[in-house]
Amino acid sequence: MRKLIVAVLIVVALAVAADFAAAAYAEHTLATQLRQELTLPSDPSVRINGFPFLTQALAGHYTAIDVRATGATVDPLHDLDLEATLHDVDAPLAEVTSGDMHSVRAGRVDGRIRIKDTDLGRAIGIEDLRIQQPSDQEIKQLLPAGTPSGESPHGDRAPVRMVATTDLMGQRTEIIGVGLIALTGGVVRITVADVRLGRDGVGAVGLPRAVRQTLLNALSTTVKPGELPFAVTPTRVWVETGSVVVEGTAANVSLSGVSRSSARCVALQCPLTLTSQSSTRQFV
């Protein structure tokens, strides 16, 4: 009896190992093909969810596939994270193993771009920029009524807190700006409504009017971070600690020839629309 149990365990272990090996091969093949289709500088990370893999492969249907590429460039941003979750993917086994994606199609794709605060700060000339979610008190006192909170369902507007250290009247000083991020037609507009010194409380007015206005203009900016993966139209924006996330959803997406125009921009560093109301980053 013991020998039978051991034999069964060995068979199960070998089956699991074979399943993981097959999944790893398929993920590698898919990553290589997606690198070509999206014209990425390196293979993205690909994870095929669900177990066992071989059952999904034989059926030619996958519940969900996660794709992530890091360090993408759309000038002047140089450290974008591109992410996508592909749901209900139909992919014949022969195409998965051969790398041919002609018939591969996803029922739904959730695509997103993650803009890191360090990357955005370099682009607008604020090297130590930190992006955070504002407190409930800041949202209530400083932003218009009806502004969504950080816990609200993601929409086309989100509150943002921007912290930076700058030269102010000859001294290195921490400043805090609170405002709104709005997503319109794929363009991310950051409008700072209030700015204060880091040592001041919420709503404090401790800055001269001219300096305050200059800081408001310096922190407000407009960014168009390219198209989302798989030609997904961006419809939602929100703030996480350290980044701004732009997301959208598309239905019935073919993975053959996906988003070639935006992919070329990632590879060739096409110009990105980024403007600020003020180019001044040092204040006297």
Residue spans of the language-model regions?
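Hydrophobic membrane-targeting and insertion signals
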Residues: 1-58, 71-76, 256-284
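Short secondary-structure junctions
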Residues: 37-43, 126, 227-231
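N-terminal beta-strand/beta-hairpin edge segment
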Residues: 41-121, 125-168
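A short, surface-exposed beta-strand/turn
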Residues: 82-92, 177-186, 261-284
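Hydrophobic membrane/lipid-contacting segments
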Residues: 87-94, 149-209, 244, 249-250
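Extracytoplasmic/luminal low-complexity segments enriched in Pro/Gly and acidic/polar residues
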Residues: 191-284
